[in-house]
């Protein structure tokens, strides 16, 4: 298994977001603002769903990587650290999924 983590990718996104938009896809997405980055995330998510639905494991792996990358760009623009998302996942896993969902619906 790779030692590469989402935290590593978050650091790369942060570094590349500071580059010139002419030299970095990440910087170009960030410069385009949240609507552009969110649209690209949606496109990649649809491609991942289609790969999953057709059983294309190789393409699903590729598209899943795109989804994770573009999600981190969207989070960067929104100034939401990955640490916050991980804390939310940790909170949710402290209880069953059904209980967590019921708690969300009642609030």
From Swiss-Prot:
A single GO cellular-component term on record: cytoplasm
Q: Which residues cross the membrane?
A: none
Name the reaction it catalyses: 1-(5-phospho-beta-D-ribosyl)-ATP + H2O = 1-(5-phospho-beta-D-ribosyl)-5'-AMP + diphosphate + H(+)
Q: Where in the cell is it found?
A: Cytoplasm
Q: Which pathway does the database say it acts in? A: Amino-acid biosynthesis; L-histidine biosynthesis; L-histidine from 5-phospho-alpha-D-ribose 1-diphosphate: step 2/9
Give the EC number.
Answer: 3.6.1.31
MF annotations from Gene Ontology = ATP binding; phosphoribosyl-ATP diphosphatase activity
Q: Which UniProt keywords apply?
A: Amino-acid biosynthesis, ATP-binding, Cytoplasm, Histidine biosynthesis, Hydrolase, Nucleotide-binding
Principal subcellular localization: cytoplasm
Query: What SUPFAM superfamilies does this protein's entry cite?
Result: all-alpha NTP pyrophosphatases (SSF101386)
This protein's source sits in the domain of life called Bacteria
* Pfam families assigned to the protein according to its UniProt record, in alphabetical order: PRA-PH
**Which EC class is this protein assigned?**
hydrolase
Question: What GO terms in the biological process aspect are recorded for it?
Answer: L-histidine biosynthetic process
Which family is this protein grouped under? Belongs to the PRA-PH family.
From the Swiss-Prot or TrEMBL record, give the protein name: Phosphoribosyl-ATP pyrophosphatase
Q: Please spell out the taxonomic lineage of the organism that makes this protein.
A: Bacteria, Pseudomonadati, Pseudomonadota, Alphaproteobacteria, Hyphomicrobiales
């Amino acid at each position: 298994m790779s030692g590469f983590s989402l935290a590593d990718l978050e650091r790369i996104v942060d570094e590349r977001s500071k580059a010139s938009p002419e030299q970095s896809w990440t910087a170009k997405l960030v410069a385009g603002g949240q609507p552009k980055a969110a649209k690209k995330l949606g496109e990649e998510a649809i491609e991942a769903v289609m790969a999953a639905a057709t059983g294309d494991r190789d393409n699903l792996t590729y598209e899943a990587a795109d989804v994770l990358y573009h999600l981190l760009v969207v989070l960067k623009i929104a100034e939401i650290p990955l640490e916050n998302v991980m804390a939310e996942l940790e909170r949710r896993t402290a209880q069953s999924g059904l209980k967590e969902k019921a708690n969300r619906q009642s609030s």
